[in-house]
Amino acid sequence: MAQKARIRLSGTSPVNLDGVCDQVKAIANRTGVSISGPVPLPTKKLVVPVRKSPSGDGTATWDHWEMRVHKRLIDIAADERALRQLMRIQVPKDISIEIVLQN
């Protein structure tokens, strides 16, 4: 059985995330390895409620700040050439990549 690399991408900008996914797919097509994905995983929504008034006096009015974390999952055959090219991808600062090798 051939090894495969499971690539898990996460970030706050879906446009940047899809751009990195397109780069990974282009590398897989160039090197001729099999690819599965990108599979969109559920978006995590982080909500922080804060008081509007700085002193705490007055009516209790609240603001809600929210950050969404988008995730994608890509499986690719663990070819040495493909993995070396994956390491050279220019990744935006708001995107994190996790690569796990599996049997």
UniProtKB/Swiss-Prot annotation:
InterPro entries: Ribosomal_uS10, Ribosomal_uS10_CS, Ribosomal_uS10_dom, Ribosomal_uS10_dom_sf, Ribosomal_uS10_euk/arc. Keywords: Ribonucleoprotein, Ribosomal protein. GO terms for cellular component: small ribosomal subunit. One of its GO terms (biological process) is translation. It comes from the Archaea. One of its GO terms (molecular function) is tRNA binding. The keyword Repeat does not apply. The keyword Amino-acid biosynthesis does not apply. Part of the 30S ribosomal subunit. Involved in the binding of tRNA to the ribosomes. PANTHER family: 30S RIBOSOMAL PROTEIN S10 FAMILY MEMBER (PTHR11700). Belongs to the universal ribosomal protein uS10 family. This is Small ribosomal subunit protein uS10. It comes from Methanococcoides burtonii (strain DSM 6242 / NBRC 107633 / OCM 468 / ACE-M). The lineage of its organism: Archaea, Methanobacteriati, Methanobacteriota, Stenosarchaea group, Methanomicrobia.
